[in-house]
Amino acid sequence: SHKVSGGLHGVGVSVVNALSSKLELTVQRAGQIHEQEYQHGVPQYPLRVVGQTERTGTKVRFWPSAETFSQTIFNVDILARRLRELSFLNAGVRIVLCDERINLEHVFDYEGGLSEKSALDIAGLPGKLADCQEKDPALSELFLVEGDSAGGSAKQGRNRKMQAILPLKGKILNVERARFDRMISSAEVGTLITALGCGIGREEYNPDKLRYHKIV
């Protein structure tokens, strides 16, 4: 928890504290719950024990200072995109984004993270990619099928050299009409984005990285 809260160089939470009008810190450690509150970087009381627990972890809650920032309203689309990236890069970490303003919750939980293996591991998501042996995207084909049962049949009848199978659970979200944050929180869409490999968005999308030139 110290590494995560401290940031890359151990100063992450210190900087956030200095730029916040208020910060609440709760630490669950060694069977006890500790808490401390800061206002504009100044502790309001010493670290104190407020209860007992069997859990471990750190919770940081902060309010950006209006004296420092001209805009203190969070953009949920930016947060969702960043948290989705982190969930891919940190295998086994479950990230939950709650927007209490409109009562929405997004869960990012990609147990396999990113992998360069032949069979792309997408554990924790509905559907698994059965990759092909061919490494040339121009010669590779991806077949999208509905459900694991259809996926099993397709895997048995495919040409393993050039045909990959990706089972998707149920009817996939219509991304043309969906909000961006809802789109990237969809497990099926996340699975598809990972399998295709070309990324999404203006900054990340790169058609040259597309892993299959034929998608059915």
Swiss-Prot record:
It comes from Acinetobacter sp. (strain SEIP 12.81). This is DNA gyrase subunit B. It is found in: Cytoplasm. Transmembrane segments: none annotated. Few gyrases are as efficient as E.coli at forming negative supercoils. Not all organisms have 2 type II topoisomerases; in organisms with a single type II topoisomerase this enzyme also has to decatenate newly replicated chromosomes. Heterotetramer, composed of two GyrA and two GyrB chains. In the heterotetramer, GyrA contains the active site tyrosine that forms a transient covalent intermediate with DNA, while GyrB binds cofactors and catalyzes ATP hydrolysis. The record marks K171, N174 as: Interaction with DNA. A type II topoisomerase that negatively supercoils closed circular double-stranded (ds) DNA in an ATP-dependent manner to modulate DNA topology and maintain chromosomes in an underwound state. Negative supercoiling favors strand separation, and DNA replication, transcription, recombination and repair, all of which involve strand separation. Also able to catalyze the interconversion of other topological isomers of dsDNA rings, including catenanes and knotted rings. Type II topoisomerases break and join 2 DNA strands simultaneously in an ATP-dependent manner. PROSITE patterns: TOPOISOMERASE_II (PS00177), TOPRIM (PS50880). GO terms for molecular function: ATP binding; DNA binding; DNA topoisomerase type II (double strand cut, ATP-hydrolyzing) activity. SMART domains: TOP2c (SM00433).
